Design a protein with these regions (language model features):
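Asp-box/BNR beta-propeller blade signature and adjacent active/binding-site loops
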Residues: 1-206
Length: 206
């Protein structure tokens, strides 16, 4: 379904909450037809039908795309958005306390992600911290992360996983916590501007 919106992009983040229920976070074109604005949709019947739930934040002057969301409790959610307001590229955090019905802006977890920006990936670790990974596209091109011990109200300084990228064409991570408490991160990567792009991986203790 198009939800009466234009330019829906398949840059989707989703959270399965029940056997037949899933909440999706997608991007649509803004009212001027340009990229982009994040919204939330939901299916309660295993994908037979979908309903629009809410926009995440006001329509931006720049863009708001490629969301990463996490359900904190029954009604509490957090969403991290790839944001651009020239000349800045950053990651902005929103929170909902009514099961995605409305959202309020919290903060910027990452003040700068480098040229063009990069989307985040987010999980809750077993020790309760929120863990957010992203690609940094300015030199030194790198994979970095931040953590929060207060459900996203504040964030620590960025920590570098690796910084040997060949150029800015990198990032788009996915993460999972392993049974030993380490984190497995996979991401789009390159070793040289003219080299092949590939999926890289790192395992580390956060």
């Amino acid at each position: 379904p198009a939800f009466d919106l234009r330019g829906i992009a398949a840059r989707t983040d989703y959270v399965v909450t029940r056997p037949a229920e899933m909440t999706l976070f997608l991007t649509a074109a803004k009212s001027d037809g340009k990229e982009g604005r994040v919204f939330c949709a939901r299916t309660a019947d295993g994908g037979r039908s979908f309903e629009f739930v809410s926009f995440v934040g006001d329509e931006p002057k720049g863009f708001s795309i490629m969301p990463a969301a996490l359900r904190l409790s029954k009604d509490s959610w957090i969403a991290a958005l790839r944001r651009r307001e020239p000349p800045r590229n950053f990651i902005e955090i929103y929170r909902s306390e009514d099961d995605c019905g409305t959202w309020r802006r919290m903060n910027e977890s990452i003040a700068e992600t480098g040229q063009g920006g990069n989307p985040p990936a987010i999980v809750r670790l077993r020790d309760g911290r929120l863990f957010m990974l992203y690609g940094y596209r300015d030199a030194p091109q790198s994979i970095r992360y931040v953590t929060s011990a207060d459900e996203g109200r504040s964030w620590g300084d960025p920590i570098t996983v690796r910084e040997d990228g060949g150029c800015s064409d990198l990032g788009y991570p996915r993460i999972v916590e392993r049974t030993d408490g380490s984190v497995l991160a996979v991401y789009y990567w390159n070793d040289h501007p003219e080299g092949e792009r590939y999926i890289g991986a790192s395992v580390f203790q956060p």
